[in-house]
Amino acid sequence: MEIVWEVLFLLQANFIVCISAQQNSPKIHEGWWAYKEVVQGSFVPVPSFWGLVNSAWNLCSVGKRQSPVNIETSHMIFDPFLTPLRINTGGRKVSGTMYNTGRHVSLRLDKEHLVNISGGPMTYSHRLEEIRLHFGSEDSQGSEHLLNGQAFSGEVQLIHYNHELYTNVTEAAKSPNGLVVVSIFIKVSDSSNPFLNRMLNRDTITRITYKNDAYLLQGLNIEELYPETSSFITYDGSMTIPPCYETANWIIMNKPVYITRMQMHSLRLLSQNQPSQIFLSMSDNFRPVQSLNNRCIRTNINFSLQGKDCPNNRAQKLQYRVNEWLLK
């Protein structure tokens, strides 16, 4: 009955319904990309050009397993072999440095504080490397992934690498079974997620107003970032920034987390430039959705358990439509 309750809750929250440029040296253009059309009045490649300006980024244009995507709930299939996620912090709180990268708010954990994740669709254990925030200039946009065509105000992405097979995230990002990204949608509310509250309170967020600003955070409990649900959606995709390697397994949690309107306003006041340059808000730092190309969208939400408690039989119908879609 727990799964039934979650699905019905998300129905009310509108979250889940019952469930040719010149080719130059890669090194020259390593950081030469942007999300928006204009950066200080000069041309910097926006997402539609990422794969054209750098031969090492060609997957951004020609890849068939790119991210983010629009999750159509009618295309989800229940996978009984998806186990619950297991987060191992060693029973300790962690420290990390929060950065304004000019494109994201990024939190990188100190190397002595290891947080591993396993279970779900994973065969191997993966180690948390970075937490990244995407958010919009308006509440109606900001997330990279969409749900039935709907965007959320933001998206938290926890980027993990396969530490059993690879020595670091750089090596893993280029390799099979290299990355797992846990994605959590953000909504604006009167209350705030405890973990995000630590990151976004005024005393903290104002320390990283400009590009390259950094601030140390201590005593963080990673488990507080996760919403109270064991349900998720998963698919095979890519990183959403150049070079768009198709080595990421995405796990999208079935409930959002919340931040206050003031905290969202503080995010929108972050600059993608340095103090000596013109102010340009970091907001709208998301890549447009990419074609699904018949990839399978799996979930551990068992629609068939809803029975008579569900106000309609849409979930049961979804199962049959999913099966037909996969056979096409």
Curated annotation (Swiss-Prot):
Chain ranges of the Alpha-carbonic anhydrase domain: 31-301
A GO molecular function held by the record: zinc ion binding
Top-rank lineage group of the source organism: Eukaryota
Pfam family name, one: Carb_anhydrase
UniProt function note: Does not have a catalytic activity.
Entry similarity comment: Belongs to the alpha-carbonic anhydrase family.
Protein name, entry field: Carbonic anhydrase-related protein 10
Protein encoded by which gene: CA10
